[in-house]
Each structure stands twice: as C-alpha cells, then as structure tokens.
Amino acid sequence: MKFVAGLTCHLCGATYPAEASWVCSGCLGPLEVSYDYSAIRKTISRSVIESRPRSLWRYLELLPVREPLTGFNSGYTPLVRATRLARELGVTELYLKDDSVNHPTFSYKDRVVSIAATRAVELGFQVFGCASTGNLAGSVAAHAARAV
C-alpha cells in the first residue's frame, strides 16, 4: 500500500484516503484506487517482478494491499494461444487467459477475492459475505476460511 495515493470517484473525481469505503459520499459513484506511478517506476522493474513467485502477489506494489495474507497462489494462470480464433477474427495473434485452473476454486473470481479478502483482514474485518449463487460465493468462502 505504500504506493497507493488514495481513492478517486470514477464519476465525479472526488478523492478520499485509502480506507474502508467503496462509494463516493457526494454522488455514490464507485471509488477506484489511485497509485503514485512515478514512485512505482523508481522502485520496481519488470525484471524484479519476473523474478518473483508465479502468483498475483508478484505484483504486490501494484495491488491495494500491504502483504499477501490468504495463502492462496491465485492469479498466475496460463495464456493459451488461439490461432484459429485469431485467424477467424482477422488478428495476427490472440491469447486467452485460462482461469479454469485458478486457485482455490478454479474460477476467475479467485483473483479479485484474494485481494479483497486480504484487504478486509488488513482493515480488521473478521466476517466476510457476498450476494452470489455461484463462483463468487465459493471463492469468498474458501478465502474467508483461510484468512480468518
């Protein structure tokens, strides 16, 4: 989180400190994490990132958390070259991200839930919940069981 500058409203541009808030108090727009990219550029390089373990946590400075807490290696899923689909679409190269091998629940939802669960623990939350009938609920349950 040392490179997080704060939160910015996607609709009106209002800024907030990086704390437990997700909507703008003025317009109820969603808040997005703002980063100090010049500081990141001075501190980290592509070679540093590539030398780290293969999980989403190799990008820690670019994530809105302090340390990985949930213990899952979510996010480092393979890119699969789609030659025939590329030809059909008229593009030179096309790669698809295979999130069916993501951990712990084999869903693309695991990537974002790993980060959300980690941030929730950092903010002191001990109970997690979500409105879902599918993959999101499974991922939240798996991460909550490990995180708390």
Locate predicted features.
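PLP-dependent amino-acid enzyme catalytic core
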Residues: M1-V148
